Amino acid sequence: MIVFSSLQIRRGVRVLLDNATATINPGQKVGLVGKNGCGKSTLLALLKNEISADGGSYTFPGSWQLAWVNQETPALPQAALEYVIDGDREYRQLEAQLHDANERNDGHAIATIHGKLDAIDAWSIRSRAASLLHGLGFSNEQLERPVSDFSGGWRMRLNLAQALICRSDLLLLDEPTNHLDLDAVIWLEKWLKSYQGTLILISHDRDFLDPIVDKIIHIEQQSMFEYTGNYSSFEVQRATRLAQQQAMYESQQERVAHLQSYIDRFRAKATKAKQAQSRIKMLERMELIAPAHVDNPFRFSFRAPESLPNPLLKMEKVSAGYGDRIILDSIKLNLVPGSRIGLLGRNGAGKSTLIKLLAGELAPVSGEIGLAKGIKLGYFAQHQLEYLRADESPLQHLARLAPQELEQKLRDYLGGFGFQGDKVTEETRRFSGGEKARLVLALIVWQRPNLLLLDEPTNHLDLDMRQALTEALIEFEGALVVVSHDRHLLRSTTDDLYLVHDRKVEPFDGDLEDYQQWLSDVQKQENQTDEAPKENANSAQARKDQKRREAELRAQTQPLRKEIARLEKEMEKLNAQLAQAEEKLGDSELYDQNRKAELTACLQQQASAKSGLEECEMAWLEAQEQLEQMLLEGQSN
């Protein structure tokens, strides 16, 4: 059992949790939810013994084996499969002991170790590791490739597989779907449903949470609130609790007003002074119930487009690719006002390539793309977060689009996206990934597009913002094409699903559950093909061709790999600076008046490191995305 009792956690001067209490029973699967920055990841860091509590206590069995996803993956020469097996630390220890016993020819030790290996099912570990990697999207050929060959997103999948292979009692997962496509999300959901240990899962994907968790811990107002059931059940229970809280608050405010009125009237009258004083004490003793904040903090909608030409966009026999590699071939697509299309397809099939083609970021190799007069594109992709001007605020970004508008109108509009008070005029260099994503969306919505192209728009967004975006998209009058691993968003906002597969883009006859079955069928076919003898693959010429292709791919990707390595070194340096600054800020004596200059310098160091780290991370993400795309294309040829 995990017990948090009167827990207090600070980050510098900011209190994240105060007198927070919660209990998690063995075997429970808990969804940890709350707004960005409320302390969810910090709570996991506490359980991992990376930080200490500032007050209160927490306990869990000392014998428990913990597993979590490492955030760093060095460019190792080790094979992917072996790297994943490293996640089972007991197996690796026994393996080393067995090697040593064999060297010493110690028969008794060998027998004892074999017994321990039998007990942990060690003989199946390679097949279990391969199964995890297949589920996360790796091909058989990739299992023996060195870790250094993979881009950042794929290395995060390796880290996830490493955490899953550990025979853990407690599994801690912080946004595990962020680097996954829909196929891998569906597979991970099945795996976690069958997991036998205790799970604490942070996710902003309600459709991912619902079938997995049986309890929700919601962090808000520096407290932890416990709810039995899945996320959908939590929503209903919380709404009920807040409604009751609001009713209590309103009733209490009537009582407070009555008492205050009495005090104001009779405080100065000698004959009534004693009664007034008793009312004052009563008022002070009353526990003030905070007003319930039921409303979503994000409020925005798409204004009607200025024009809705029909069709908005038309593609005829369009082919697309990179260099001499064709990714999509002979595409036919017609987008009209009201088209609401969700793109499905396996990783590397070409979904993002199609979005770039529609957005004009990628020129077709052949065929024609017809754009209507008056078309206005709204295009969202992760790399666009980089295009924000680091030295400008949200208000300055929006004012550039609307120079004639009153500043108050722009401020009111930005408030609907969570930019209020000083945040409206803060430089974006200090913004988190979620804040940058909200600002890019705000700029898109302002421009009244009639064709929206969204490539994974929910990455970095919390549940409240995802819900606000979903509601706004439902009311959008133009055409929509979206790629997302958020199934709730896909179900709620799209009418038609298109499958990107085998270089084709075609309507998919079915829903997301049917797509899940399609994935399963394709995987079975591929497994059967892998098991069949391949005379050609064993030929000397085939091996020679394979080596040639691998050498060409290494040469093509070498400049990107060097840039990624440079950025990783820079991020490591900035992380060290940030950690140093935050360690200093955690010292309460630093806030003494006589150390004001030191505090200011420390805060400046923290801000500078955060800003530099954010810029580095965005450049790293774009480089990783380019490398990932090149590697995927290389594997498909």
Curated annotation (Swiss-Prot):
Every ABC transporter domain range? 2-246, 313-527
Protein name per its UniProtKB record: Probable ATP-binding protein YheS
Gene symbol of the encoding locus: yheS
**CDD domains registered for this protein in UniProt:** ABCF_EF-3 (cd03221)
- List, alphabetically, the SUPFAM superfamilies matched: P-loop containing nucleoside triphosphate hydrolases
Family as reported in the entry's similarity comment = Belongs to the ABC transporter superfamily. ABCF family. YheS subfamily.
Annotated region Disordered: the residues are 523-559
In which organism is this protein found?
Escherichia coli O6:H1 (strain CFT073 / ATCC 700928 / UPEC)
Please give the SMART domains that the UniProt record associates with this protein: AAA
In which residue ranges is the amino acid composition biased (Basic and acidic residues)?
542-553
Enumerate the residues binding ATP. Answer: 34-41, 345-352
Q: What's the superkingdom here? A: Bacteria
Which Pfam families does the record cross-reference, listed alphabetically? ABC_tran, ABC_tran_Xtn
- Gene3D superfamilies referenced in this protein's UniProt entry, alphabetically: P-loop containing nucleotide triphosphate hydrolases (3.40.50.300)
| Keyword terms, alphabetized | ATP-binding, Nucleotide-binding, Repeat
Record-level Gene Ontology MF annotations = ATP binding; ATP hydrolysis activity
Loss of function: phenotype: No visible growth or ribosome-associated phenotype.
Q: In UniProt terms, what function does this protein have?
A: Genetic data indicate it may be involved in ribosome assembly or function. Ectopic expression exacerbates the cold-sensitive growth phenotype of a bipA deletion.
